[in-house]
A protein has these predicted regions:
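Active-/binding-site microenvironments in catalytic and ligand-binding cores
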Residues: 1-138
Length: 138
């Protein structure tokens, strides 16, 4: 039920010795996809904080993704704190997009790959399922 903070993001970047560049796409591997076929997938994951989301936008990273079922903390944690979809709501005032339920992030290198995202063409919605494909130059 915890959230990823700005300090968590900075620490993770330092760990892989990487400095964000404008228009980088940031994919966050929380480990949740390791148990996405279990009930706890919906209740036991880490989400992004609104502050960390805004920080990524300030770094000119406008697309992010996570292997968790939602970009925010689990629904039960949001109800407990009475803060519903805070990271999602950043989209109401900032131009960014996020992708949820990603899998196989551990098969990608920490950086240096391309990402293509193919959404289903739905009309009148704010979201749709996608096929996300990591492209690694060899």
């Amino acid at each position: 039920g915890s959230v990823i903070t700005v300090d968590d993001m900075k620490s993770a970047l330092a760990k892989i010795d990487y400095t964000l560049k404008a228009r980088d796409i940031v994919l966050i591997r929380t480990g949740a996809s390791d148990y996405n076929d279990e009930d706890r997938y919906l209740t036991d994951h880490v989400g992004m904080s609104a502050e960390a989301t805004r920080w990524l936008i300030e770094q000119d990273c406008l697309v992010t993704g996570t292997d968790a079922p939602t970009y925010d903390a689990p629904v039960w944690a949001m109800f407990k704190t009475k803060s519903i979809w805070p990271a999602h709501k950043v989209m109401m005032s900032e131009p960014y997009w996020h992708i949820e339920n990603l899998t196989n992030l551990g098969d990608l290198p920490p950086h240096g790959f391309k990402l293509s995202v193919f959404p289903i063409k739905w009309v009148g919605t704010t979201g749709a399922p996608v096929r996300a494909v990591g492209i690694i130059d060899v």
